[in-house]
Amino acid sequence: MNTELVAMEPGVSRNGVRTETTTNPSLGLHTYDIVVVVIYFVFVLAVGIWSSIRASRGTVGGYFLAGRSMTWWPIGASLMSSNVGSGLFIGLAGTGAAGGLAVGGFEWNATFLLLALGWIFVPVYIAAGVVTMPQYLKKRFGGQRIQVYMSVLSLILYIFTKISTDIFSGALFIQMALGWNLYLSTVILLVVTAVYTIAGGLTAVIYTDALQTVIMVGGALVLMFLGFQEVGWYPGLQQLYRQAIPNTTVPNTTCHLPRPDAFHMLRDPVNGDIPWPGLIFGLTVLATWCWCTDQVIVQRSLAAKNLSHAKGGSVLGGYLKILPMFFIVMPGMISRALYPDEVACVDPDICQRVCGARVGCSNIAYPKLVMALMPVGLRGLMIAVIMAALMSSLTSIFNSSSTLFAIDVWQRFRRQASEQELMVVGRLFVVFLVVISILWIPIIQSSNSGQLFDYIQSITSYLAPPITALFLLAIFCKRVNEPGAFWGLMFGLVVGILRMILEFSYSAPACGEMDRRPAVLKDFHYLYFALLLCGLTAIIIVVISFFTEPIPDDKLARLTWWTRNCAVSDLQKKTSVSVNNTEDDNSPGLAGRPVVEGPAGDEEEANTTQGPEQPGALHRSWGKWLWNWFCGLSGAPQQALSPAEKAVLEQKLTSIEEEPLWRRVCNINAIILLAINIFLWGYFA
């Protein structure tokens, strides 16, 4: 459908809805808004300090796995808030404004994988007795090259994708809503976030995540109801969204028109912007990596008291992941329906004036709706919501990155590192991440805001599928060995990088430009590519494994789905010890200390290291005392457990037994959750 350049009366769109034409309105915060934001920060710091004081922070397990003491509800809330960062509020609402409901499938797909995490992956991880995902691969396959590759790859992804996305999105909202200085506001957020992450470890992170989840869901639901009230609820949204055309368009193009399939989840497999086979199958590959093998997510479930609490956390997280479709995607569509001249702009000059990006301004959909619809006081609440999303995701990344660095990287260089050294190194690495995050701000500012989220998605589709294939085969196929796993990963990495080079060599065309990209890019969706890459990597892993020597069955005890319930006999213990002692890449920082092997750090263990103050302790300076508390260092000497005590503790920490009642409760709730999710897919398909 061709249109001509149209200039209508300012402030009136084609659908007759009044729109605001000011690009950067100077909206001063009311006193009530400021009070709400201050109360939010006070609550977060109070919860962080409270959880830091009560936490077991002086051991690897206490700091990195919350002492294996978390119950189901903070785990479920933390799973939600760790994933729903400020980037999701900005990016998901923006994609919904541009393309409709289909992007909500990314959230609903997570429900299935969260249940897979609790019922399939976590039992194996707990039985294996691991703290990090690279550590599991090392136990499963032996050798060190896979562990080091996975650790470094994860850290690179965290620093240059997750952290940068969240900071960019939070900065975009703060700039538009508050007019604060970008650097000052971001530095304050990062410093407050880092302080309770460093001080309290995973316990502080999970409890503050739980608080922020309540704030996020509550504030977002308020905005959702106000938005639906403004457009006439769902029927009104359907009508107004289809008419949401900006006043100024590019001649002879259809870029400005809303998609005709905007209210359908399942779209054409060839011409759809999110084809349905890719949404169901290709996305599952990426989601498996995100929810079942990514350290940020899995670490929360590994902190559970027992397997039933881990399953309960997955169920709660699955229910919470149903909500973003309604309080993020649909408000994004409402924003386009109400303010098409800004949110749906297509003329590059107008877009540059509105949001500073010539390719489009869909990213401002959510903050635009907040500033236009929320009344005094509630506007401050929504600012707190975005800050909560930003800080909760950053704390998760900081804590998980410090875990990976201390356990999987630092111990490669310091094989005899003491437990206290690991605690200090993990905390100092968080400081390093904060510095990198601040230095990354100018790069984010100069980046094209319209391409940043495409960049994040493409990075995932290029690098995640081989990891998904490896973990699935590691857990379900005992025949897979280390050579097959390593060379399969290398093959997947090379193919993914080749696609990445093509992607960034040929940028997507702007509205009105001819698409000159090769067919492998413009006609082969990245979700299809993810599915293909996962399949090819799996084939390479299996073929090489079958042509090389298999791993003996006695070395796979409690490391696969089929051997997760194997009793830890004396023979298996000796085998495990001999493997660790003969491997060149042994990690004495974990295995060499009796209380830290596997998911170390139970509350009982913490008590053995938190002894009474020494007689000379009263003469220590307050500064030294504060430093020792901050770093989780105890003045008392560590007490080594006897072999019998160690065996009892290790058996407790690696137990996947469940009480029959709670196992049935979890199973019933999982079935109900699946039924609700499948109904929603069918209703919006």
UniProtKB/Swiss-Prot annotation:
Residue ranges that the UniProt entry lists as topological domain Extracellular: 1-32, 95-110, 175-186, 235-271, 335-379, 445-455, 505-526
Compartment(s): Cell membrane
Disordered, as annotated region: 1-20, 577-616
Alphabetic keyword roster: Cell membrane, Glycoprotein, Ion transport, Membrane, Sodium, Sodium transport, Sugar transport, Symport, Transmembrane, Transmembrane helix, Transport
Transmembrane segments: 33-53, 72-94, 111-131, 154-174, 187-207, 214-234, 272-292, 314-334, 380-402, 424-444, 456-476, 484-504, 527-547, 665-685
GO cellular component: plasma membrane
InterPro entries per the UniProt record, alphabetical: Na/Glc_symporter_sf, Na/solute_symporter, Na/solute_symporter_CS
Residues with glycosylation annotation: N247
UniProt main location, coarse: membrane
Catalytic reactions of this protein: D-mannose(out) + n Na(+)(out) = D-mannose(in) + n Na(+)(in)
Entry GO MF terms: symporter activity
Record family assignment: Belongs to the sodium:solute symporter (SSF) (TC 2.A.21) family.
NCBIfam families: sss (TIGR00813)
Entry protein name: Sodium/glucose cotransporter 4
